[in-house]
């Protein structure tokens, strides 16, 4: 037991994530250590607006032999290499509890954000981002009529395993609740039953009052580095009011969401003057049977970027993180400050 007074900026500590029920080890004293690890080459930042060899550009032929239309806004098509199958059969039950198998069904789609091969989300005009939001909502609602979970997400950049440079996202519809969603369903419901209020609605109010982890605030939206963030510059984007699914957003809230996404992703790119890689996606109330209470759910987006110190140095979740629990050096408050310190106007637009 130490006689020194605890200081979260200097002393190692753990932070609890009430959404997942897991802890994150924070080691702020390590942030000053010298770095001699991997230094990756940054991705090519200048791309043409059209690439005749790109499978996602308008009028080009894909691997399947299908030809893309001359689309002007977003374009959605069935993933040519889907991870799920609509007609997959049920798996036989096993009498051995150590070898369980569950048959699953679903489908995967690709969403091209725009016809421009060179423009990522932060580089698109707000009205184009608004079109992406509308497409997300349409796809989620359509597939939610048949599947209990619909995951909308984007992997941006080669670092995140993106195999096509043309800016795009994906939609995976599942006949089952994935692990992350099942954990959130359990913890959100438990909080709601114990406190009589929505965890993330309460969290927004707490973050607005604190202020130290806020990155972007608009009329209807708040982006923060979560108190329990595991990735260096991880953020969560939430509405300021109780919204269970994207379909419940008003036109004003959707317009404002486009502005919030533009500001947040521009700050990411501006941090290291590069096309900032990340995995992002939306969480919202699953599509349970009609009549099921979903008031404990709150719409939110999660951004998980791997960059740590520069455009070429990234965080690796290895060793202790894989075998024990997530660990970070930079505190959430320090990360938020660094993101606040850069402009929300994209460096290419200045």
Indicate residue ranges for each PLM-predicted region:
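Active-site microenvironments that recognize anionic phosphate/pyrophosphate groups
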Residues: 1-166, 172-244, 249-252, 265-266, ...
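Internal helical hairpin/lid segments
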Residues: 259-276
């Amino acid at each position: 037991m130490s006689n020194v007074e605890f200081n979260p900026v200097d002393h190692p500590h753990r932070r609890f994530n009430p959404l997942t029920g897991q802890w994150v080890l924070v080691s702020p004293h390590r942030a000053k250590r010298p770095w001699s690890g991997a230094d990756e080459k940054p991705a090519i930042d200048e791309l043409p607006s059209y690439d005749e060899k790109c499978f996602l550009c308008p009028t080009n032929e894909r691997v399947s032999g299908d030809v893309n239309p001359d689309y002007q806004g977003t374009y959605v098509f069935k993933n040519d290499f889907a991870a799920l199958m609509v007609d997959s059969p049920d798996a036989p039950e096993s009498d051995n509890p150590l070898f369980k198998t569950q048959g699953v069904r679903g489908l995967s789609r690709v969403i091209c954000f725009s016809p421009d091969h060179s423009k990522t989300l932060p580089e698109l005009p707000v009205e184009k981002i608004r079109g992406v939001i509308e497409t997300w909502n349409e796809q989620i609602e359509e597939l939610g009529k048949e599947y209990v979970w619909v995951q909308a997400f984007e992997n941006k950049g080669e670092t995140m395993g993106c195999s096509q440079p043309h800016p795009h996202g994906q939609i995976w519809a599942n006949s089952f609740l994935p692990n992350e969603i099942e954990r959130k369903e359990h913890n959100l419901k438990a909080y709601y039953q114990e406190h009589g209020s929505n965890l993330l609605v309460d969290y927004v109010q707490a973050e607005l009052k604190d202020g130290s982890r806020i990155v972007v605030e608009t009329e209807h939206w708040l982006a923060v580095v979560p108190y329990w963030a595991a990735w260096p510059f991880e953020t969560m984007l939430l509405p300021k009011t109780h919204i269970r699914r994207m379909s419940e957003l008003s036109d004003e809230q959707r317009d404002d969401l486009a502005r919030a996404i533009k500001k947040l992703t521009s700050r990411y790119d501006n941090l290291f003057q590069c096309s900032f890689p990340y995995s992002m996606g939306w969480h919202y109330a699953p599509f349970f049977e009609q009549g099921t209470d979903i008031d404990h759910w709150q719409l939110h987006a999660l951004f998980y970027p791997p960059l740590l110190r520069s455009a070429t140095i990234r965080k690796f979740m290895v060793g202790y993180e894989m075998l024990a629990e997530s660990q970070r050096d930079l505190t959430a408050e320090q990360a938020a400050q660094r993101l606040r310190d850069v402009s929300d106007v994209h460096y290419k637009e200045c």
